[in-house]
Amino acid sequence: MIGFAAAHAALWTLILVQLKAAQDIHMDVAEAFGWGQKFQLGYGKHPPLAGWIAGFWFKIFPVADWATYALAMATLGCGLVICWLISLRVVDRRRAFFVVVMLALYPIFNFKGFKYNPDLLQLVTLPLMVLAYLNAFPRRSVMSGLWLGLAGALALMTKYWVLTMIGAIGLAALIHPERRKFLGSPAPWVAIVTLAVAMIPHLIWLEEVDFVPLTYAGSVYSLSSRAYTAQLVLGYIGHNLVLLLVPVALAALALACVPARLRMQTRLASLFTRAHKAAENAVVDISQAINVWIVQVVVALGAPLGALIFTVYLKTDWGISLFFLTPLALVAIPSLRLQSRALFNIAAIWLVVTVATLVASPYIAAREIADNPNGASGYADRSQLARELTQAWHARFRTRWAVVAASMEVGEPMTFYSPDHPARLTLDEPWSSGLTSIDEAKRLGFIGICDSRQAALPECEAWMRANAANAEPLTITTRRFFRGHPGPAITWNAYIAPPAN
């Protein structure tokens, strides 16, 4: 299975490099790279794990677009391996392989898995937590509880959204028919204590920054309109159902293409009820399957219901990490007949889809920018802007460009694409990443940037007047050309504020 996951990650890295060749990397990826430039216990909006991993990754690999796609696919490859281990706790190897290939066909694990960020990293840490729970539930030992607590802490260090999954696991432990055995053992209580102790350093950081992530969440995702919340919830449900429909439909196709002769043999075998029941018990661990079913149902229903109750802005991307158990929940249905031929079929479907996409990806990239040059934010040539501003800074001061003051959409790509990797200073946001400050920016000098197309242009220019009164204004226009097709021409208003000395 490690070989399959590695092949999937390698092939889809090649695909994404070609599919995204006409674009700069997503701002979320650049943000994670920026976090990784400085080790902290948190980064304003989120816990630190995504930044730590990005920092480690780019100490090994070059700061290049392809390395970001490789990071995303390496993350998903690890997720596939962990989901394989989860599946083996519930079903036999045949069904477990079917589950993993279904996940590889799930768009989150291929097309939509192009941007490394805390949402994507949850597809490693949440499966690890589920695996630890499925290990602790039957063992009920101190050591299994310790691993469960550490896995929970690791997940919480990825994104606070994982509380959704932690709550689902807690409910599974309370609802499961064998709950008395588990709750009467040391495992769950050791897990709770371990998680609490492991989170102490981060909790201290939260107090030091006055719980700024909660300020961020309340400011950005709290809504006043219940009707608008309901609209977002419907969009979230529809979006994630469509994504799940892809692997489910392809799995159904793989099952339907089993020859009639093999299906008839299965029907004849099922006439021997006692043998049939024994076979069911051999391939599905019903006790563990119940855990999986409960967890998946709770997170599937809990997120939209919670958003409706608390009027929260429910982003479609928040479903990225919540449905990796769906293929297993379906394949673990004991009455499902899974022939060896179905494994060949679904593996063949994966191979055909992957190879066809690999061949077509250069043409898809060229066609997309030709048909809709304003269709993606990444078509704006921020990488060229970063290079030109770096040259402008060096020509004036002959020092490293240390700070960029801009919105996330503009500033984070500067951090990634400039060889100086300046830290981004947020403009009038109370949830600073902590990577720099206005005092440090004024001491070291900075470049402020306003996008002339942004609705917030007046606010950006007002900030520059207030904080960069002595800055040199500079106007730069960038435009990307990809295989003869032009992207949007963007005018950027830059402000070069010199160092204090």
What are the language-model segments listed below?
Residues 108-122:
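Short acidic/glycine- and proline-prone juxtamembrane loop motifs at membrane-interface regions
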Residues 8-9, 96-107, 152, 156, ...:
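Short helix- or helix-capping micro-motifs
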Residues 39, 290, 294, 310-346:
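Hydrophobic/aromatic-rich transmembrane helices and adjacent perimembrane loops
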Residues 70-91, 128-132:
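Transmembrane-helix motifs of polytopic, lipid-linked glycan transferases
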Residues 22, 312-316, 340-399, 408-423, ...:
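Membrane-proximal, lumen/periplasm-facing interface regions of secretory-pathway glyco-
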Residues 88-89, 93-94, 129-147, 334:
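Membrane-interface transmembrane helices that cradle and orient dolichyl/undecaprenyl
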Residues 48-52, 61-81, 112-116:
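Loop-to-helix entry region of an early transmembrane alpha helix in multi-pass inner-membrane enzymes
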